[in-house]
Amino acid sequence: MIRQAILLAVALMATTACGTRESLPVRPPVDSPVIPPSKIVDFSFLYARNCAGCHGPDGKGGAAIGLGDPVYLAIADDATIRRITADGVPRTTMPAFAQHSGGMLTDDQINVIIGGIRSRWAKPDALRGADPPPYRAPSPGDPRRGAGVYGIYCSSCHGADGRGGRASSIVDGSYLGLVSDQTLRTTVIVGRPELGAPDWRDDVPGKPMTSEDVSDVVAWLAAQRPQFPGQPYSTALQFRGGVR
């Protein structure tokens, strides 16, 4: 038995020794390049690691606005997208990515992401012949008028009270607590085509929304936002003077 075990061990050693050099694990060369994370400037890599989780791997289909939507890219200029990417949007799920705002990306990397989004997905003629509402609201909307605008342009999908119909609820407190008024405005203007939500031109055929319509319906939606999203809490968690 001992002799057989020795012969088996020798055979295994011989087999291993016959392996090619390429098949054996080797230490990387001393001069092998190691790229620091801050020096990576490949768009596909940066987008996949920092953007795809919320905005979708191809700029659409994610929980957030589609960065690959040509209509969005036609109304939002590079300075706007850069500011949002660098500094984030307070009180929403959009974090800051720039190092100067507590993120991990350099200014050069943010420029690479913006340039890649623009070159890959923008279409110069996306709004040819159209007159879209401006990205930013020129003036505050009126929630009372907004209720009427909602009834005309939105209720057929989201229900008469906004709590859902063919499409999901648009007055859900948790949703409204996670988006800014600007996000609501942008979504109303550009829609979510991958989810079946039309842009400002196609809610009512032949009657596109005006900038005032958009501002008013956003004001109405914002008025539905709870002061403290997530409440009411269970009475078991409440105590005199506040919430545990």
Predicted features along the sequence, with ranges:
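Gly/Gly-Pro-rich "capping" loops immediately C-terminal to redox-active cysteine motifs
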Residues: 33-37, 44, 60-86, 96, ...
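Conserved functional loop/turn residues at catalytic and ligand-binding sites
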Residues: 50, 55-58, 153, 161, ...
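Bacterial N-terminal signal peptides that target proteins for export
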Residues: 1-6
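C-terminal motif of bacterial Sec signal peptides marking the signal peptidase cleavage site
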Residues: 14-17
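Hydrophobic alpha-helical targeting segments used for export or membrane insertion
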Residues: 7-12
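Calcium-coordinating acidic loop motifs
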Residues: 89-90, 192
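Intrinsically disordered, glycine/charged-rich N-terminal periplasmic/extracytoplasmic linker segments
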Residues: 50-53, 57-61, 65-84, 90-96, ...
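Flexible coil segments in periplasmic/lumen-exposed cytochrome c-class electron-transfer proteins
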Residues: 19-33, 37, 41, 45-48, ...
